[in-house]
């Protein structure tokens, strides 16, 4: 069966892109990275794409509508069926988001709907929560909204600062994003309003990573 073609949009280091590249290196993984697009020419993620022979493009210095048109053209030429935002730090044109509705996903370093937007780790620490994590969701026009596909939970430990919490969450992101893309590629998801139902699995077995597992791995 042909693998799902994924287009990844990045702005920076591309560590979640690398997690998807690593997953797709397994020939049994049901998705492949067809193209990478960055809005910044200095994004380290472009080097990651180049090193593995993935077509990559820079679309910069354009207004929102022009950026959307150029990006949509690249995605179409690559035969992309799913767009994955991976550390992509530009707000997308509403028409573009609507055109890719239910075919575009994002990963955010908090347990949405808590702590959307910028500095979610800072928000989590200020709120005094005991657990944080990351969320993969289908993209909607409002920032960090849309039906939730999967979440990973990590503990907030005594003495954490933004950097230590971000590092713990990032490790979970690298596990969660390939899982979520797999679920999309295997057509195991059904959107019901603002909920995502996963065929053949009962949450939290598939739709979440267990906090005790993350706690144990963090201390190993």
Label for each model-derived stretch:
Residues 1-44, 48:
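N-terminal Rossmann-like dinucleotide-binding module
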Residues 57-62, 107:
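Short beta->alpha connector loops at strand-helix junctions that form conserved
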Residues 119, 193-220:
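Internal anion-binding site segments
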